[in-house]
Amino acid sequence: MGNLRVDVITLFPEMFSAITEYGITSRAVKQGLLQVTCWNPRDYTTDRHHTVDDRPFGGGPGMVMKIKPLEDALVSARQATGASAKVIYLSPQGRKLTQQAVKGLAEQESLILIAGRYEGIDERFIEAHVDEEWSIGDYVLSGGELPAMVLIDAVTRLLPGALGHVDSAEEDSFTDGLLDCPHYTRPEVYADQRVPDVLLSGNHAHIRRWRMKQSLGRTFERRADLLESRSLSGEEKKLLEEYLRERDDS
């Protein structure tokens, strides 16, 4: 896992300034850990209207992105990044993007992301060129740009040196298959609500145990499905039972 180059084929390259100019991803760009390059299919059209879409065969609402501008943009992206780059189409039909999948993508040196628009892109382009399809959730968006930015942000967090603290990525939600524990900062008391005493104790073993217990309990209450695919250790089972006991007694 090292530096990452991401090439994005998009009709709205300006949207990706949110990645290159703000936050952790911007810092990664400035540090040379991340490179983001956009390719606009409109730049590969030959008609005066720069047409990138057309009506779907068989009828129906909306428009479909044409193959040729997408294919020509992909050729340019491949020439710039190398033929081995994995091509990913952001699509509601794709597999759901998980932290485990993000870890796999972070192992790549380069990615080419296809951000569709309208009713989608011509299926023949997908069959000929796309290696993987990924979805960020079971809902419909206006285009693939936001999912592409979500993917870039998630992958960037795993690049060595991208985060301010070496442990930050490892302690994120889902990294260990669990939701994150609650977090607190100063003041210790606000509107009569106190920070849990254990976090002020300075006892790192007790703090670690409390955080794991909260993480397990939160996952059980909010995303029990995550526990179905995770084998709990003896300590984790004990902590979850303790959490549920304390919850029921309160």
From Swiss-Prot:
* Major location category of this protein: cytoplasm
**Record: residues binding S-adenosyl-L-methionine:** 116, 136-141
Catalytic activities: guanosine(37) in tRNA + S-adenosyl-L-methionine = N(1)-methylguanosine(37) in tRNA + S-adenosyl-L-homocysteine + H(+)
What Enzyme Commission number(s) apply to this enzyme? 2.1.1.228
Q: Provide the alphabetized UniProt keywords.
A: Cytoplasm, Methyltransferase, S-adenosyl-L-methionine, Transferase, tRNA processing
Q: An example Gene Ontology cellular component term from the record?
A: cytosol
Q: How does it assemble?
A: Homodimer.
Q: What is this protein called?
A: tRNA (guanine-N(1)-)-methyltransferase
The species is Pseudomonas putida (strain W619)
Q: Which gene encodes it?
A: trmD
